């Protein structure tokens, strides 16, 4: 029995919720193969068995180790879907069928079929040390090369001069951007480029106004020191108050300027599974409610 799984609360590139079963002679252009992709970004488990009768079985779904759900009488629970496809002409055809299905039936809205922009991101060039002048210099060089979009990365908000503080305080840092976000966006657009911006909404720094005001919003087990990753904790996204706060702050930023693109980052996995919103016998619902 082969297994691919994640109990980190996320899927990601580390453990991807997909699998391919293929014949030994399968190549990119020849051979038979089955593919399955779990449409879910939380903890998952894929098990594949090949038994003594030469029968293959695949099971793919929510990871059972962290999952519990109290189902009331007459209530329902909708499990996430799995995309399943087959190719008798190799892995390339299998990939194309997945891509076509996702593009035509999973992607939605006006962005479904538009051409994706070529973009430049300031992160590796500046890290947290930037101002409007530095960002515009990058944009000017990128525009000269024909780049379509500039994405402003981490550090534009709160007191965010390193990765130890400021996460959760989604207010423009006007010491770095003197004219505010709107002025910078206008200048970038004047170069013929679009503008994108970075968020990491799930996260909170202990050194932030948000955490000082609402420490109870962070996922942590009472009476224990929390596990930190990249010097940050996670917000309890199953909490409606947290959802409302993030929706309001992110909406205000996106409505404050002509922003075309969001880079939604997530730089750590989830641990310390506990929420004050559920009793002890229902804590296993948090991983799915979080997603």
Feature map (PLM): residue ranges:
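N-terminal accessory beta-strand-rich subdomains and adjacent acidic, glycine-rich linkers
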Residues: 1-102
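Glycine-rich, aromatic-flanked loop segments that form ligand/cofactor-binding clefts
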Residues: 18, 22-44, 86-110, 118, ...
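Catalytic cores of glycan-processing enzymes that make or break glycosidic bonds
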Residues: 54, 71, 78-83, 122-123, ...
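Glycine- and charge-enriched low-complexity intrinsically disordered segments
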Residues: 111-127
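Short coil-to-beta-strand
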Residues: 114-115, 145-154, 259-266, 270-271
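Aromatic- and glycine-enriched glycan-recognition loops and surfaces
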Residues: 126-212, 244-248, 289-291
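Active-site neighborhood of glycoside hydrolase catalytic domains
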Residues: 173-190, 211-291
């Amino acid at each position: 029995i082969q297994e691919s799984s994640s109990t980190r609360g996320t899927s990601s590139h580390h453990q991807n919720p997909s699998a391919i079963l293929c014949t030994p002679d399968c190549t990119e252009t020849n051979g038979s193969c089955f593919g399955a992709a779990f449409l879910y970004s939380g903890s998952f488990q894929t098990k594949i068995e090949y038994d003594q009768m030469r029968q293959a079985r695949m099971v793919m779904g929510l990871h059972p180790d962290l999952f519990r759900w109290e189902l009331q009488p007459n209530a329902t629970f909708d499990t996430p879907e799995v995309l399943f496809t087959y190719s008798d002409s190799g892995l390339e055809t299998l990939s194309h069928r997945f891509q076509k299905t996702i593009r035509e039936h999973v992607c939605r809205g006006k962005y479904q079929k538009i051409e994706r922009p070529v973009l430049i991101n300031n992160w590796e060039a500046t890290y947290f040390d930037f101002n409007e002048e530095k960002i515009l210099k990058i944009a000017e060089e990128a525009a000269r090369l024909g780049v379509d979009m500039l994405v402003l990365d981490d550090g534009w908000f709160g007191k965010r001069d390193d990765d130890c503080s400021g996460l959760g305080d989604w207010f423009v840092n006007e010491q770095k951007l003197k004219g505010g976000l709107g002025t910078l966006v206008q200048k970038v657009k004047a170069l013929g480029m679009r503008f994108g911006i970075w968020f990491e909404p799930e996260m909170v720094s202990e050194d932030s106004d948000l955490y000082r005001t609402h420490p109870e919003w962070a996922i942590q087990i009472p009476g224990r020191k929390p596990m930190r990753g990249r010097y940050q904790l996670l917000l309890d996204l199953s909490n409606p108050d947290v959802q409302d706060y993030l929706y309001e702050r992110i909406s205000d930023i996106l409505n404050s300027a002509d922003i075309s693109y969001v880079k939604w980052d997530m730089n750590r996995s989830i641990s310390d599974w506990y929420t004050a919103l559920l009793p002890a016998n229902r804590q296993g619902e948090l991983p799915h409610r979080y997603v």
